[in-house]
Amino acid sequence: GPFNLKTWELNNKIVVEKNPNYWDASMVKLNQIHYYPVSNVMTEDRMFRAGQLHVTSTLPSQKCPIYIEENNPDLRIDPYMGTYFYRLNTNNPVLEDVRVRKALAYSIDRRLLVEKVTKCGQIPAYSFTPPGSNGYQPDTSIPFDPKLAKELLNEAGYSEENSFPKLEILFNTNEDHRKVALAIQQMWQQNLGISVELVNQDWKVYLSREM
């Protein structure tokens, strides 16, 4: 590639330098790039505004609408081919029932999530294929329909007499992940009466829990 690894200080800094043997080395304008691991998005934003970082792809969600309104030249929003989603553990007998999984999906207000939680130009996704992608777009979708969600949960056998067991949302350490999880926790509680526990783990523990 255009750069070679020079140094790697764990949890401190990674330095890469220009690779003179790269096939198009004359077009590589940077001699070095320094990468800094910053776990807190507010800290990263302050470092960027103070000139300690030249580029950051992480922005506090509450700052994004302010930068958009100010037409801040430092902010660049480009299309991103990706979908934010949750995986459900179907080894759990409760979540094995497709009616339960549909109920959980129908009770999430995706438009509210992008307008009030993420707030940085995201588009509600009603299928796994990202919105606006070329090629096949499915006709079916899962809109926000709390009435249907409640009916599906009742069909699955859950009611006031037979309450739904507590669910757990596992997310890795990130303020934006926490905000999304908190919003979904509230939606499932309000629309379905389901109690949800939020569990925050650092990345390594998060991955081990998913295995």
How would you name each of these model-derived features?
Residues 1-5, 26, 31, 62-63, ...:
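Surface-exposed, Gly/Pro/Thr- and Asp/Glu-enriched linker/hinge segments
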Residues 4, 15-18, 24, 76, ...:
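Append "and occasionally in soluble cytosolic enzymes with long acidic Gly/Pro-rich linkers
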Residues 11, 28-30, 70, 81-83, ...:
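Extracytoplasmic
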Residues 43-45, 53, 64, 100, ...:
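Short, hydrophobic alpha-helical packing/hinge segments within bilobed ligand-binding/sensory domains
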Residues 54-55, 187-211:
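Periplasmic binding protein-like
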Residues 74-88, 132:
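Periplasmic-binding protein-like
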